[in-house]
């Protein structure tokens, strides 16, 4: 077993990659190891995802903000295509854009501590050879591979 320490956000990112992984080229033992790693990450990643969704809902500037945002996106699309009959003024659009920026800043502030929280996990790591086979079974970017390096022996 290997004890690792990751930030909550790193666990969530790794889980999103490993939970969708294909295992075809792995030995049976390595398939089980990767599956067990996924199960260790799952509850942490799922709770973090719930926390993010909860914050997104509870920290909305107003109940009608999602509708305002849709209207602003429609305005922007129509304006960019040269349409003359627009659903709002530039001033109204700017006000919604400012609300959006403020909302995102509040979300970032609210979730920063949660995302950076350190989590200790015990896993049974896989060999470099097995990791190579796992990569060969999946079409991962370099960034995705880096997020999974912790599963190596």
Placement of each model-derived feature along the sequence:
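A composition-driven surface/loop motif
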Residues: 1-153
